[in-house]
Design a protein with these regions (language model features):
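Aromatic (tryptophan-biased) beta-strands that constitute blades/sheets of beta-rich domains
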Residues: 9-34, 63, 68-75, 113-116, ...
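Repeated scaffold domains used in trafficking and secretory/extracellular systems
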Residues: 29-42, 76-85, 120-128, 168-181, ...
Length: 276
């Protein structure tokens, strides 16, 4: 869960288990503004690390155990999401400059710059498909894929392809793209609805007729689907399930995205270790 300018791991009952604040981190003072308004928080490497972005420009990989920032970089104007590639390199999506950027993740130097950028209309999301070795992102109402060159030292995205296009009412304004737990499918949220794209059948259906969902995260049986629907501007102090029931609430929180701490085998192998 992200609260204004810091990141927390919490129980549903509101108990805070862990938090990370840039002000008390190793990030240089002049770079801390990059971490203003966190915008993504993906559990990676068997939920031992968090891959985060912030609207101020940051992308970062943070180790949960000791809160160490393993790598950080400037990822453009208003980053909304990031993804790990199989070799540990990172891709980030930034919406204001409408691009995705690729980084060589140098955990020895601890920082770096984008190796290359690629234009993507209103870029808001990036998801790796480990079965097909494809990177997905949305561009307007299109689902786009890229291939990766698997060159860790000189990473590049190639062979852009338009995979699927949404038509009709409620399809404008793509926002979150995230794997459906236990399925070979993606949740795809827009200004008007939540769609589910089935990769095998290449078909898209309406999963939930709910507007303005900024983040969605599902889990195994017994774990409700977690959503953020703004109640003020882009944020809310609570998270809901598809029926609108409040799953988590914290007074004065300005939450933008939330993810269950659950291994994501759509994007990463069951045993997923960082190469430091």
């Amino acid at each position: 869960v992200m609260r204004i300018n810091f990141i927390v791991i919490a129980k549903e009952n509101g108990t805070i288990l862990w938090e990370w604040r840039v002000a008390t981190s190793s990030i240089p003072t002049d770079k801390q503004i990059w971490f203003h308004n966190p915008s993504e928080v993906k559990p990676v490497y068997n939920s031992k690390y968090l891959l985060v972005t912030a609207s101020g420009g940051a992308v970062a990989l943070i180790r949960i155990a000791d809160k160490k920032v393993m790598f950080y970089a400037y990822a453009g104007a208003n980053p909304h999401s990031a993804e790990l590639l199989p070799d540990g390199n990172i891709v980030a999506a930034s919406s204001t400059d409408q691009q995705i950027s690729i980084f060589r993740t140098d955990t020895l130097a601890g920082t770096g710059k984008a190796v290359e950028t690629y234009p993507v209309s209103a870029a808001h999301n990036v998801v790796w498909d480990r079965m097909k070795n494809l990177l997905y992102t949305t561009a307007g109402n299109y689902l786009i894929s890229y291939e990766y060159n698997f060159d860790k030292e000189n990473p590049a995205l190639v062979n852009r392809n338009e995979v699927y296009r949404l038509y009709g009412e409620g399809t404008e304004g793509s926002h979150d793209l995230f794997p459906v737990y236990g399925e070979y499918a993606l949740y795809w949220t827009t200004n008007g609805k939540i769609f589910k794209y089935d990769i095998v059948s290449d078909k898209c259906s309406i999963a939930y007729d709910i507007k303005e969902i900024k983040s969605i995260s599902s889990g195994p049986d017994g774990i409700p689907t977690l959503m953020l629907q703004p109640t003020e501007s882009w944020w809310s102090d609570h998270l809901i399930d598809p029926e609108g029931n409040i799953l988590f609430q914290k007074q004065n929180y300005k939450i933008y995205k939330a993810r269950w701490i659950i291994d994501n085998t759509f994007s990463y192998p069951p045993i997923h270790l960082i190469n430091e």
